[in-house]
């Protein structure tokens, strides 16, 4: 949520900031702005709307060798010009951008800024006014540090001082922020993707650290004044990975990339003998536990439900799955030796990170499944397994979901083999995942079929229901989430056996009901449920796997191993959501009110 880009160097920062903000659009935002510093003149341009709207407002001759930019997701105050970032102090000396939530900003207003008038409704403006207040008696660095010491909550901040053209200041706590190293310039960014065109060498800023940046270098130190030395790392990304290429939308590109991602996971977790292999220390850690808790949000939570099924079948360890945002309110009754698995595409999800901090304080061991090496949850967990999905730009997750399930399958089968589970020993997972990849290719080559179904069932619908049983129920929930995210249709995924316990009351003439069937054991049960809603006027559609398909089913899913069916059955559901959104003229990659990476609680 929100994004920051900062630049200090010898070139004009304008284009670098605007292009960087474009690369951060996937994080979600409702307004944007930049500030350019040219000698002692600071020019601020900001507005509600898209980056393209902002770019049209920036004067063609705007210039500054130091600058900061921001995309805002409203948390305090409406999305409007006044609340957009950057914010300036009363005199205009200080200009700031900020991601995060300051929990005690009203108290700080009362205690320190009673006589100040505020232009915006934001917590951010309180920070910049505090800095100016303290700068009456302190240096900029010390005033910044004093203000930071008073803040309760999360922040990533970039600050410029009108009286100092040679320095850019930044700090973070619980919100991501990086330093990008260049020659005669340095950059600050929420995400490496924002500035990959400028540099691929980065240094992490840790919580409660401040960084003083010039064009020639930077100094990291704690709020207590202790200097910090930290090695840089090279981002394992290519600028071309974050371009759409010939695709109209990132989401469609990322759906099409799933076969390649699945094969990449096979290669990443294969040993020299061609067998799927997981780090032995991870296996030993998990097998020594007596219960596994999977903690995740949204799509990752749905992947976790599939993971529970796989791990319990193979490893014979009980698994609980928790929604991150609810986990901290009522901790489960802990067994003697639990282990926690955190699933997060970005590795920065605020709710999941807070859960990880809590369980580590309690002394429990942790494993993160993430797509971003070097992310906060990757650094802070005891162990990590990577998804190898490459950058996922579209807000609606597709390839990260299938990557999560694939890696969970790798983990489950590896655990099962360690304990001699017959099913785990009998499955050639590399081969079976290869079959999945081939099935995915066949389905992404049948887009026109799904496009037609989307137009027929969903183009003008106000709501839709997805039905499934057993493992198909988990995919039904993910299918409904995808549809509601990008088409704005009120969609829900249900266990079809629960229809008669309330949901069937919502069925009326023309209600779209889509059923997923991949398991022989529940084939006729769910078809009975389909007939029930059909009798009450629903417009029904069945997506079925080859071995259970019947005449009249609208889409046949190629056969894959029974434990891996979610990897296949979700593909037509993703395409269905995509084409439904197109039919309804929705913004596929940047749906309203949504953020890719939720970095505030």
Swiss-Prot record:
Pfam families: GATase_6, SIS. This is Glutamine--fructose-6-phosphate aminotransferase [isomerizing]. Gene3D superfamilies: Glucose-6-phosphate isomerase like protein, domain 1, Glutamine Phosphoribosylpyrophosphate, subunit 1, domain 1. Residues 2-216 form the Glutamine amidotransferase type-2 domain. PANTHER family: GLUCOSAMINE--FRUCTOSE-6-PHOSPHATE AMINOTRANSFERASE, ISOMERIZING, GLUTAMINE--FRUCTOSE-6-PHOSPHATE TRANSAMINASE (ISOMERIZING). It comes from Listeria innocua serovar 6a (strain ATCC BAA-680 / CLIP 11262). Keywords: Aminotransferase, Cytoplasm, Glutamine amidotransferase, Repeat, Transferase. Its main location: cytoplasm. The lineage of its organism: Bacteria, Bacillati, Bacillota, Bacilli, Bacillales. InterPro entries: GATase_2_dom, GFAT, GFAT_N, GlmS/AgaS_SIS, GlmS/FrlB_SIS, Ntn_hydrolases_N, SIS_dom, SIS_dom_sf. It is an enzyme of class 2 (transferase). Transmembrane segments: none annotated. Residues 282-421, 453-591 form the SIS domain. One of its GO terms (molecular function) is carbohydrate derivative binding. Its EC number is 2.6.1.16.
């Amino acid at each position: 949520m929100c994004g920051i880009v900062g630049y200090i160097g010898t070139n004009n920062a304008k284009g670098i900031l605007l292009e960087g903000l474009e690369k951060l659009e996937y994080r979600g935002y409702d307004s944007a702005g930049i500030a350019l510093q040219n000698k002692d003149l600071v020019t601020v341009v900001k507005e509600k709307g898209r980056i393209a709207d902002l770019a049209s407002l920036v004067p063609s001759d705007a210039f500054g060798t130091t600058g900061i930019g921001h995309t805002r997701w409203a948390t305090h105050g409406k999305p409007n010009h006044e609340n957009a970032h950057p914010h300036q102090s009363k005199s205009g000396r200080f200009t700031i951008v900020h991601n995060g939530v300051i929990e005690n900003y009203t108290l700080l207003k009362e205690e320190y800024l009673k006589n100040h008038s505020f232009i915006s409704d934001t917590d951010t403006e309180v920070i910049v006014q505090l800095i100016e207040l303290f700068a009456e008696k302190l240096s900029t660095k010390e005033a910044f540090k004093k203000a930071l010491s008073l803040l309760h909550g999360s922040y990533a901040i970039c600050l410029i001082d009108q009286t100092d053209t040679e320095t850019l200041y930044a700090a973070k706590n619980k919100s991501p922020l990086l330093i990008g190293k260049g020659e005669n310039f340095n950059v600050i960014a929420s995400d490496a993707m924002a500035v990959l065109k400028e540099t691929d060498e980065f240094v992490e800023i840790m919580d409660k650290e401040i960084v003083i940046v010039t064009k020639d270098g930077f100094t990291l130190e704690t709020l207590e004044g202790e200097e910090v030395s930290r090695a840089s790392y090279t981002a394992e990304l290519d600028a071309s990975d974050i371009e759409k290429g010939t695709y109209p939308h990132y989401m469609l590109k990322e759906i099409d990339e799933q076969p390649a991602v699945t094969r990449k996971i096979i290669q990443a977790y294969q040993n020299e003998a061609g067998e799927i292999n997981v780090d032995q220390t991870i296996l030993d850690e998990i097998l020594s536990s007596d219960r596994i808790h999977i903690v995740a949000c949204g799509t990752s939570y749905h992947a976790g439900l599939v993971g529970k099924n796989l791990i319990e079948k193979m490893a014979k360890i009980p698994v609980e799955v928790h929604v991150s945002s609810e986990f901290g309110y009522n901790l489960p009754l802990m067994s003697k030796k639990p282990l926690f698995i955190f699933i997060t595409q970005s590795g920065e999800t605020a709710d999941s990170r807070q859960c990880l901090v809590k369980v580590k304080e309690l002394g429990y061991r942790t494993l993160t499944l993430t797509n971003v090496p070097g992310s906060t949850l990757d650094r802070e967990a005891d162990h990590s397994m990577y998804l190898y999905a490459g950058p996922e730009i579209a807000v609606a997750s597709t390839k990260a979901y299938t990557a999560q399930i694939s890696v969970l399958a790798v983990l489950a089968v590896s655990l099962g083999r360690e304990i001699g589970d017959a099913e785990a020993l009998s499955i050639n997972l590399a081969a079976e995942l290869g079959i999945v990849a081939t099935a995915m290719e066949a389905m992404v080559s049948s887009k026109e079929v799904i496009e037609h179904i989307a137009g027929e069932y969903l183009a003008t619908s106000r709501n839709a229901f997805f039905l499934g049983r057993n493992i198909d129920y988990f995919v039904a929930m993910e299918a409904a989430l995808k549809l509601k995210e990008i088409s704005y249709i009120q969609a829900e995924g249900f266990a079809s056996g629960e229809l008669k316990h309330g949901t069937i009351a919502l069925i009326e003439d023309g209600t779209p009901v889509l059923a997923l069937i991949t398991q022989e054991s529940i084939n006729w049960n769910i078809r009975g449920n389909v007939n029930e809603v059909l009798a009450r006027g629903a417009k029904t559609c069945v997506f079925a796997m080859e071995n259970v398909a019947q005449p009249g089913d609208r889409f046949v899913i190629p056969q894959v191993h029974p434990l891996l069916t979610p990897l296949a059955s979700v593909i037509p559901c993703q395409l269905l959501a995509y084409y439904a959104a197109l039919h309804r003229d929705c913004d596929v990659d940047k749906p309203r009110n949504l953020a890719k990476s939720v970095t505030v609680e």
